[in-house]
């Protein structure tokens, strides 16, 4: 019944926003960070703590180690969009989902066909030279034997948000606008423990707040509907109900 209720709310909504976290991509084989099987708990042979390896300080102080870690654990070229990504893209094409806000950096929403995507933490597919500002494809990062360099000699870094760095103000503004003007907000695959992204929920003033997560979160009681199940299974079922 919960899936049917969500499908009904999507059909009657004039602005549905999906706000997703790492759980959106785990079904594509990309590990998260904080779960029992996540990156922080499974990698013990690193030269520095995992959180430092993902920090601005590490990029500046130990760039070779940073990029070795980044290429090994943050970029997943074998990953493909899963059923949840595809369902959201289909719902967007049908005019039933207006915006996707993601904390993921893998670009799988766009690969599935979604167009209105706000990437709060950036993307592995956007890279730039710190010296001249030139944009570079992911291959420049992946194919470099060590620290990737631009033809000008500057270091090429990924446009992803590292620890000690702030989210882009334009992305935050766009996400705030999308959430504050939505009448249905679907939050999926996130424990809402990462700030400032999690704080965006306070801007929601719409009719229905829905959580889809395998595990309970501390925010469940604030939702109008909670579905403890996989995102791919849930969103596919909802898509079929909305688009028979």
UniProtKB/Swiss-Prot annotation:
Binding site for nicotinamide: 33, 105-106
Coarse class of the protein's main subcellular location: cytoplasm
Species in which this protein is naturally found: Cutibacterium acnes (strain DSM 16379 / KPA171202) (Propionibacterium acnes)
Cofactor: Zn(2+)
Reactions the enzyme catalyzes: N(6)-acetyl-L-lysyl-[protein] + NAD(+) + H2O = 2''-O-acetyl-ADP-D-ribose + nicotinamide + L-lysyl-[protein]
Localization, UniProt: Cytoplasm
Any single Pfam family the record assigns to this protein: SIR2
Protein name: NAD-dependent protein deacetylase
UniProt function note: NAD-dependent protein deacetylase which modulates the activities of several enzymes which are inactive in their acetylated form.
Family of the protein in this entry: Belongs to the sirtuin family. Class U subfamily.
UniProt feature coiled coil, ranges: none
Binding site for Zn(2+): 129, 132, 150, 152
Alphabetical keyword list: Cytoplasm, Metal-binding, NAD, Transferase, Zinc
Name of the coding gene: cobB
SUPFAM superfamilies: DHS-like NAD/FAD-binding domain
EC number in record: 2.3.1.286
Keyword Glycoprotein carried by entry: no
